[in-house]
Swiss-Prot record:
Protein role: Catalyzes the conversion of L-lactate to pyruvate. Is coupled to the respiratory chain.
Main location: membrane
Protein's recorded name: L-lactate dehydrogenase
Gene3D superfamilies linked: Aldolase class I
Protein's membrane topology: Peripheral membrane protein
Pfam families: FMN_dh
Length: 396
């Protein structure tokens, strides 16, 4: 198969992966309205083409948390990467490291912190949920610090699991799920050999290290469901801020007031995110939420964004809407499932090339020159009437 764009990796991943794994990452919550809008809204952000600007000295470099990055991109935390490729977290981290961008290890990774961190040169980031088991949280933070992780990404939009109906049909959960997964693996021999057999153990490495026993897929679903904490508030984050002395990023912000609270709390960054449409269906797409948040806190805190980003053009759009850096999730996982480290490396090269084309044709020589002036109109004003936000008089 010819891979010429990030979308090609999605098609290839669907052929490679057992359905329960493909649909787990490809799907969203409820009817997947927000999942679709993440992509659709971003795709309709119209860029302002400029010409004859002498773009020979174009640069994608940016600075984030006192580090220079070759482009404003990092790999987002994605659970179960090690089920999508053999020791998937190690391969994805290696690709990010070679490119010089951050890799974020998920709490629910297959490969534990101690397996991934020594394989790369630059410090990785670590993502943590707020869980009932504060002992696990402290243990994870201590291990992340010991491994040299530089930045903590604290996910706050999962006080309760989202309702992901697709998982019940695909075999990730629901009746007879284990049997469905077995037969799906049999029908996908390449994955079964490379990952299913040779990619073992499939423990949730960070959780197994804490519990002192193996944890499989069923444990993942049950342990997380029982440990999400709906009582979470900003006060619960105070002891983490005291414990963690590196940059701390709050992931899951969609409202300007929550962004202001993050500034008051003393966070170093936020991620404008709806969890890729996997939590509450019907909330704003990240592209729609971002401009108001940028208006509220730009310059006071680093603004990262995810959800709906599929290519380099989308990266430029998010920067123009107000982000400082973006996180890639699904896009890199499709590439990882298709071709491992080489797939992720190629995806990052594609995104870099697409960004250079977009910046050249919008007259932005540097990342700092990408702004609202790079857009024809702000998102919402340039959308077709059917997609534009309803006025009060239009509301049913």
């Amino acid at each position: 198969m010819i891979i010429s764009a990030a979308s090609d990796y999605r098609a290839a991943a669907q052929r490679t992966l057992p359905p329960f794994l493909f649909h787990y990452i490809d799907g969203g919550a409820y009817a997947e309205y927000t999942l679709r809008r993440n992509v659709e809204d971003l795709s309709q952000v119209a860029l302002r083409q400029r010409v004859l600007k002498n773009m020979s000295d174009l640069s994608l470099e940016t600075t984030l948390f006192n580090e220079t990055l070759p482009m404003p991109v990092a790999l987002a935390p994605v659970g179960l990467c090690g089920m999508y490729a053999r020791r998937g977290e190690v391969q994805a981290a290696a690709a990010a490291d070679a490119k010089g961008i951050p890799f974020t290890l998920s709490t629910v990774s297959v490969c534990p912190i101690e397996e991934v961190a020594p394989t790369i040169q630059r410090p990785m980031w670590f993502q943590l949920y707020v869980l009932r088991d504060r002992g696990f949280m402290r243990n994870a933070l201590e291990r992340a610090k010991a491994a040299g992780c530089s930045t903590l990404v604290f996910t706050v939009d999962m006080p309760t699991p989202g309702a992901r109906y697709r998982d019940a049909h695909s075999g990730m959960s629901g009746p007879n799920a284990a049997m469905l997964r077995y037969w799906q693996a049999v029908m996908h021999p390449k994955w079964a050999w490379d990952v299913g057999l040779n990619g073992r153990p499939h423990d949730l490495g960070n959780i197994s290290a804490y519990l002192g026993k193996p944890t499989g897929l069923e444990d993942y679903i049950g342990w997380l469901a029982n440990n999400f904490d709906p009582s979470i508030s900003w006060k619960d984050l105070e002891w983490i801020r005291e414990f963690w002395d590196g940059p701390m990023v709050i992931k899951g912000i969609l409202d300007p007031e929550d962004a202001r609270d993050a500034v008051r709390f003393g966070a170093d960054g936020i991620v404008v995110s709806n969890h890729g449409g996997r939590q509450l269906d019907g909330v704003l797409s990240s592209a729609r939420a971002l401009p108001a948040i940028a208006d509220a806190v730009k310059g006071d805190i680093a603004i990262l964004a995810d959800s709906g980003i599929r290519n380099g053009l989308d990266v430029v759009r998010m920067i123009a809407l107000g982000a400082d850096t973006v996180l890639l999730g699904r896009a890199y996982l499709y590439a990882l499932a298709t071709a491992g480290k080489a797939g992720v490396a190629n995806l990052l090269d594609l995104i870099e090339k697409e960004m250079k084309v977009a910046m050249t044709l919008t007259g932005a020589k540097t990342i700092s020159e990408i702004s609202g002036d790079s857009l024809v109109q702000e998102l919402g004003k340039s959308l077709p009437a059917a997609l534009a936000p309803m006025s009060k008089g239009d509301a049913a």
